[in-house]
A protein has these predicted regions:
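ATP-binding N-terminal substructure of ATP-dependent carboxylate-amine bond-forming enzymes
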Residues: 1-100
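A conserved helix-loop-beta module that forms one wall/lid of the active-site cleft
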Residues: 96-158
């Protein structure tokens, strides 16, 4: 039976995504108080902010305990990858967001690639490398054009889509030997460049149960006409018509079901957002990437579409 208690909520993060979450949570009749840490100049017009860095997870846990928050929502991936979810749960504070063993799906693209292969989930052909010479050999001999990905977190900027094999080799060496992306580039994923249209599928997950939000599409290239380097996202829209009912059925059957079953087999009690980036290819949707939080900018176009109470859905994910 759902409690009618008003909830004091802490949202962690400082971007447009967190502002969208603030505005959505504020619509909840169950809200009793709201703070965003660290927030930003726009967010502080809509709720109280606290000057605590999103990656200072010990300070966040201390602040949440001292101020008796009933619920914490982590916006970005970095706090989750550092174990914010684990530390809050250990302190008895409910949180929306996976534990560290779930957040590794985004924190390590190499882990994610191995996970996809292990559970036969459709994705691009590819291989993980820590040695630049081995990576070059693979790139030059591959029967397909390649994409080079830093394995670790890089704020959405760790993917290089080269125009030639020489560019691909240079990108791989820059990551593995030149220090591009720091520790995040010490291991890379070299994979087939897939052809098709991308879409972002956001799931709100509780173990083997989930709610799928409308498909969205973000545009990552920095330049006009979809040119230049990838960014975390230059803009987005939703719903994305390219994700037809047939595509979404295939996503549910061939991607979501084996992913959630695989997480359970790996001992992961996943509770939070799972973002599945897909490429809609001629042979069906394939996984481009996993993220363990709402996309930014996608969250900014999804939250205004939500008619249900976001806080209630998040609480249901947490409670099972």
């Amino acid at each position: 039976m759902q409690s009618d208690k008003k909830l004091k909520v802490l949202i962690v993060g400082s971007g447009g995504r967190e502002h969208a979450l603030v505005l959505a949570v504020k619509r909840s009749p169950r809200l009793g108080g709201l703070v965003c840490a660290p927030g930003n100049g726009g967010i502080e017009r809509d709720c109280e902010v606290a000057a605590i860095a999103a990656d200072d997870i010990d300070a966040i846990v201390k602040y949440a305990k001292e101020n008796a928050f009933d619920f914490v929502i982590s916006g970005p991936e970095v706090p989750l990858s550092l174990g914010l979810g684990d530390k809050l749960r250990a302190a008895g504070i409910p949180v929306y967001g996976p534990s560290k063993n779930g957040a590794i799906l985004e924190a390590s693209k190499a882990y994610s690639k191995n996970f996809l292969k292990k559970y036969s989930i459709p994705t691009a052909e590819g291989k993980n490398f820590t040695d630049a010479d081995e990576a070059e050999k693979y790139i030059r001999n591959a029967p397909f054009d390649t994409v080079i990905k830093a394995s670790g977190l890089a704020a959405g900027k760790g993917v290089v889509i080269p125009a030639t094999r020489d560019e691909a080799v240079a990108a791989a060496r820059e990551m593995l030997e030149g220090g591009a992306f720091g520790d995040s580039g010490r291991e890379i994923v070299v994979e087939e460049k897939m052809e098709g249209e991308e879409a972002s599928i956001m799931l709100m997950v509780c173990g083997d149960k989930y709610v799928m939000l409308p498909a969205s599409q973000d545009h990552k290239r920095v330049g006009e006409g979809d040119t230049g380097l990838n960014t975390g996202g230059m803009g987005a829209y939703a719903p994305a018509a390219v994700a037809t009912p047939e595509v979404l059925d295939a996503v549910r059957k061939n991607i979501v079901a084996p992913t959630l079953a695989g997480l359970i087999k790996e001992g992961v009690d996943y509770r939070g957002t799972l973002y599945v980036g897909i490429m809609i290819t001629k042979s069906g949707p394939k996984v481009v990437e996993f993220n363990v939080r709402f996309g930014d900018p996608e969250c900014q176009v999804l939250m205004p579409l939500l008619e249900s109470d976001l806080l209630t859905i998040m609480q249901a994910c947490r409670n099972g």
